[in-house]
Amino acid sequence: MAVLTNPTAGRGRYRALLPGLLDGLAVAGRPIRLLPASSPAEAEAACRAAVADGAGALVAVGGDGTVHRALQAVAGTDVPFGPIPAGTGNDFALDTGFPADPLAAAVMIGEALRDGRSRPVDLARMVGVDGAERWYGAVLAAGFDAIVNERANRMRWPRGPRRYDLAILVELARLRPRRYTLRLDGVPHDLDAVLVAVGNCPTYGGGMRICPDADPTDGLLDVVVAGRVNRRTLVRVKPRIYQGTHVSHPLVRSFRARTVEVAAEGITSYADGERSLALPVTISAVPAALRLLR
């Protein structure tokens, strides 16, 4: 069993949990190989190498970013996967039925591996115009949230969560609808929007139910679009995302498709909260692309 650890997950709180997590995983009766990594690129490379070397299972200890790196290695393979939610955002793990308690999740994963038990779930596969391919488990953001993330990642001050808060204020001041072309199972939709999300799972950003009806076992992607929304309306609607009630707003539209093409100028998408491919991209729901240890 290969176990990817992220020293910065949950602002470092995982360090104190790690011995207990390893004890929980040990009920599987398998040797455990730790895959520490000091960067996202190293984490992804370590996971790919472990799978290529014949790992019997891959476990990721961390948040959605750590899970995202691990998915690039196990997607579309027979190697079972277990996410242990120990980050600031654990949307994929929670949306796919793992307990919020990391220790309980570790025991669940260990017992499933011991008993030879796994459950298939869908993943989303994204392809850019240059042929680059990425997988994601939760949600792709391709509108205001992606733009805010892009600005926050360029900022050197302030550090910590306040950088993201400042990026929100800056981008709210610059908010304008952008022209998108969506192609849903081949059917084109040209529209102006400030927010576009494509979900395999319901939540992103640490529990915001952006695609509240998404189901990672139905073979479909849920698309949620906020149209020509002004600053005041966006600020008022944003808190409703936590309950998923934003989809009842008259300027919010929802779609469902197996394949989704998203095109717009000047936007880099974010998948599972991680910087991903520049638009345009084509996203496909891949049924049973992942075996979960639960």
Model regions and ranges:
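ATP/NTP phosphate-donor binding region
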Residues: 1-58, 103-107
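Glycine-rich beta-alpha junction loops
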Residues: 7, 128-130, 140-146, 199-202, ...
